[in-house]
């Protein structure tokens, strides 16, 4: 899962 709270 990719954390969308991070810019990258």
Curated annotation (Swiss-Prot):
It comes from the Eukaryota. Its cofactor is Ca(2+); heme b. It is found in: Secreted. One of its GO terms (molecular function) is metal ion binding. It is an enzyme of class 1 (oxidoreductase). GO terms for biological process: hydrogen peroxide catabolic process. Its main location: secreted. The keyword Heme applies. Its EC number is 1.11.1.7. The keyword Isomerase does not apply. It catalyses: 2 a phenolic donor + H2O2 = 2 a phenolic radical donor + 2 H2O. Keywords: Calcium, Heme, Hydrogen peroxide, Iron, Metal-binding, Oxidoreductase, Peroxidase, Secreted. Binds 2 calcium ions per subunit. Binds 1 heme b (iron(II)-protoporphyrin IX) group per subunit. One of its GO terms (cellular component) is extracellular region. Belongs to the peroxidase family. Classical plant (class III) peroxidase subfamily. Removal of H(2)O(2), oxidation of toxic reductants, biosynthesis and degradation of lignin, suberization, auxin catabolism, response to environmental stresses such as wounding, pathogen attack and oxidative stress. These functions might be dependent on each isozyme/isoform in each plant tissue. This is Peroxidase 4. The lineage of its organism: Eukaryota, Viridiplantae, Streptophyta, Embryophyta, Tracheophyta.
